[in-house]
């Protein structure tokens, strides 16, 4: 049975996610296209006050959703080419987050990892740089070594970070 369908004018980038923005037990659907962040209610209607236009780039990657305190105060990281911005669940830019423009294109959705109460936002760049930021967008750890990233994401492992390079080595 088809419950509803909706025509989206541009291709959806990444997975469609469900979250409870209103904290009422009813899930909303969120996703992005090259130039818009969408929030749809459970009936497929666009929640216009929460959907917003975003700058489009040539290398648009899926949004990242962070819920730092697990209290449904969501943060959305939107990237375009080499720029990263953070929005709150009302579609407003987070004033405490410093938008970043990197020297190279972002190649994967940013990842949030918490270790010993500290938040790390991890970003992989096309030039092999690994950027590790705090929750305000400032550099938390400087990494000098370049990595030829594989398709794998970055994970927390024994209070550190791990991924694989394109040769299959754990780094």
Task: Indicate residue ranges for each PLM-predicted region.
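Extracytoplasmic/lumenal domain signature
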Residues: 1-171
């Amino acid at each position: 049975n088809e419950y509803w369908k909706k025509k989206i004018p541009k291709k959806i980038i990444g997975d469609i996610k469900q979250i409870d923005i209103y904290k009422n037990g009813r899930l909303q659907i969120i996703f992005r296209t090259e130039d818009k962040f969408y929030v749809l209610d459970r009936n497929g209607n666009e929640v216009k006050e929460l959907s917003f236009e975003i700058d489009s780039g040539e290398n648009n990657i899926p949004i990242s959703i962070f819920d730092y305190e697990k209290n449904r105060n969501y943060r959305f990281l939107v990237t375009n080419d080499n720029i990263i911005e953070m929005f709150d669940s009302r579609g407003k830019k987070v004033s405490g987050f410093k938008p970043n423009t990197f020297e190279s294109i972002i190649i994967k959705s940013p990842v949030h990892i918490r270790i010993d109460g500290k938040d790390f936002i991890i970003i992989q760049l096309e030039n092999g740089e690994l950027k590790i930021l705090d929750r305000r967008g400032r550099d938390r750890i400087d990494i000098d070594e370049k990595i030829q990233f594989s398709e794998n994401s970055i994970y927390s492992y024994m209070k550190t970070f791990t991924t694989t390079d394109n040769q299959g080595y754990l780094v």
